[in-house]
Amino acid sequence: MERIPILQMEDFLLVTIQVDMHDRLAMTLQDDLTNRIVKTGVKGVLIEISSLEIVDSFIGRILNNIATMSRILDAETVVVGMQPAVAITLVELGLSLTGVRTALSVEKGMNLLRKSLGLSADAEA
């Protein structure tokens, strides 16, 4: 079964989506990620989606669900690298991604997570 790698960096999980997302892969990512949050006890999740050129309503809902589930499991989520076409599509589909924090780059996303968790923006492991 195809899976998206989930890496741990400091007190964060980093997910870099480098393949075209389909429904089954999105569901697997949701399950894998929530399980890793519980297993590791991390406080932040960064999802990098710059390779995604197309996002449909299901994938948009999954991203929203991941952020909501992460919050329930005491971890903040930031989605980074969203392409303009993806943002336009999400708005046209009526998906506001309520509660999903975004940033333009991985660096800005990590800084946002560190700030929201009260950590130094230049903390190094």
What are these regions (language model features)?
Residues 37, 66, 111-116, 123:
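Catalytic cores of nucleotide-enabled group-transfer and carboxylate-activating enzymes in metabolic
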